[in-house]
């Protein structure tokens, strides 16, 4: 009868003699295709090249709108892109209709050296496919007559310009996102949202409904002209802190900019923060548990962000800068140790933790399992699922041991332990109380509930056996 050989720690750590010349701390250089890690410093990030914006008149905004929506407009120059962004940054205050971004910006001495003098060029061009006028659009929101939305002929120049700025600001989300196939539904929603914020509507939202191809061209233009994109990002980042005390303006900006441009490619960090908000555990405990093999650098990066940058964690964070949240739109080297493609197992584990906690769903468009880094990798998702199960077990156990834990939490944690060991041989009783809970939970094996006896569902795959944590109460 064969026996499993005993493997000691020394066996596992043994290194071949010729290989001992290699450094234990150095690592091979990353492939050139991977962006180089860049340490975030506000003083450096705020100096990325940008243009100085100017206030546009209503006539200039409407004229430019007519230009880029024309059949003849087949290419986007840097000058065109800059005008597009200036239209977006001409967004109006929903209360007094003043220009939001005229109210404040960082002092010029913090910005790039040529901030006041740099001008966009007309040389480079990006192809733009004209929106498809033949698409039949299903209207989810009814059109309004002169009591709401005016026709192109009767609507005032100011009303058109206000709607165009809102529309262009909304379209900036496609600088970092791919347009979905359901884009026409989103066009109806943006018109409805404009009505909620500004208590009026506009014919502009029916005049121009660009195709996915046009939106891809817009994304390409943002990527081709980084100085234009940088200008947008710096203004948005400044506005998040500046307008927090002004809810009506902040909510408009959150819908148009913040929720789309922040934390680009940092699904892991967003997931960690979301999980922390749902569990009664200190952030340090959660990070310690999540620092599993292969995720050390990613979790250490998350710790660095929380310890030095995250506005909810640092002293006086409410008034501190928030450019760090948008820094990856300037340079993808920022925080790239947390980038989804570099930490797939961590992403999978976090996804299943969210699913187990009811934060996210396992199926559907918004499921975290659709994240590109793990979507088609069954092996990584299986490892993530098992580690997520362990995280949930640890969370339940710790919660059940706290002094003011609910009796429900205690019984639930004990029941989860029994479920994990259900495929193993019965363990000898350690305490008399265990027999009492077994009797209370099962009421003897022969007295199954009718629904259990009649079920035709196939048995689920057993969860991996887990060593019982010390001091977990048995009932």
Swiss-Prot record:
- Does the record bear RNA-binding in its keywords? yes
- The set of disulfide-linked cysteines is none
Q: Where is the composition biased (Basic and acidic residues)?
A: 421-436, 451-460
Q: Which Pfam families match?
A: Rhabdo_ncap_2 (PF03216)
InterPro entries from the UniProt entry: Rhabdo_ncap_2
Localization, UniProt? Virion
Where does it sit, as one GO cellular component term?
ribonucleoprotein complex
Could you name the domain of life of the organism this protein comes from? Viruses
Main subcellular localisation: virion
In its keyword annotation, does this UniProt entry include Ribonucleoprotein? yes
Question: What does the UniProt keyword field contain?
Answer: Capsid protein, Helical capsid protein, Ribonucleoprotein, RNA-binding, Viral nucleoprotein, Virion
What is an example of a GO molecular function annotated in this UniProt entry?
Answer: RNA binding
Q: What are the start and end residues of every segment in region (Disordered)? A: 421-461
Q: Which family does it belong to?
A: Belongs to the nucleorhabdovirus nucleocapsid protein family.
What is the protein name stated in its UniProt record? Nucleoprotein
**What gene is this protein translated from?**
N
């Amino acid at each position: 009868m064969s026996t499993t050989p005993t493997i000691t720690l020394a066996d596992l750590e043994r290194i071949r003699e010729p290989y001992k010349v290699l450094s234990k701390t150095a690592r091979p250089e990353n492939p050139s295709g991977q962006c180089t890690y860049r340490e975030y410093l506000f003083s450096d990030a705020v100096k990325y090249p940008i243009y100085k914006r100017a206030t546009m008149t209503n006539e200039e905004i409407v004229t430019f709108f007519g230009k880029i929506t024309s059949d003849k407009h087949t290419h986007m120059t840097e000058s065109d892109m800059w005008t597009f962004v200036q239209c977006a940054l001409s967004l109006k205050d929903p209360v007094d209709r003043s220009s939001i971004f005229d109210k404040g910006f960082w002092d010029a001495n913090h910005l790039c050296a040529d901030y006041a003098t740099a001008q966009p060029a007309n040389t480079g061009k990006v192809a733009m496919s004209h929106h498809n006028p033949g698409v039949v659009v299903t209207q989810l929101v009814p059109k309004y007559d002169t009591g709401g939305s005016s026709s192109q002929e009767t609507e005032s120049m100011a009303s058109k310009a206000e709607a165009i700025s809102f529309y262009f600001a909304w379209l900036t989300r496609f600088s970092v996102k791919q347009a979905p196939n359901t884009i026409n539904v989103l066009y109806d929603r943006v018109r409805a949202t404009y009505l909620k914020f500004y208590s009026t509507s506009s014919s502009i939202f029916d005049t121009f409904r660009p195709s996915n191809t046009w939106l891809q061209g817009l994304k390409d233009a943002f990527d081709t002209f980084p100085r234009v994109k940088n200008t947008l990002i710096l203004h948005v980042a400044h506005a998040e802190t500046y307008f927090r005390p002004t809810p009506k303006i902040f909510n408009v900006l959150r819908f148009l900019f913040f929720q789309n441009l922040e934390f680009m490619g940092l699904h892991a960090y967003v997931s960690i923060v979301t999980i922390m908000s749902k569990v009664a555990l200190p952030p340090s405990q959660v990070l310690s548990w999540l620092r599993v093999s292969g995720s050390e650098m990613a979790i250490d990066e998350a710790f660095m962000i929380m310890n030095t940058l995250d506005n909810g964690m640092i002293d006086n964070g409410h008034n501190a800068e928030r450019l760090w949240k948008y820094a990856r739109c300037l340079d993808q080297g920022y925080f790239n140790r947390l980038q989804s493609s570099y930490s797939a197992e961590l992403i999978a584990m976090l996804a299943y933790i969210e699913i187990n906690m009811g934060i996210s769903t396992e199926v559907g468009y918004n499921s975290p399992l659709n994240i590109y880094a793990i979507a088609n990798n069954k092996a990584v998702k299986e490892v993530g699922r098992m580690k997520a199960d362990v995280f949930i077990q640890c969370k339940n156990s710790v919660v059940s041991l706290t002094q003011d834990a609910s009796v429900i939490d205690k019984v639930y944690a004990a029941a989860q332990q029994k479920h994990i060991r259900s495929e193993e041989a019965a363990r000898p009783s350690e305490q008399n109380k265990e027999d009492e809970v077994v009797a209370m939970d099962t009421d003897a094996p022969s007295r199954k509930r009718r629904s259990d006896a009649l079920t035709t569902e196939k048995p689920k795959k057993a969860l991996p056996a887990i060593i019982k944590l010390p001091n977990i109460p048995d009932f």
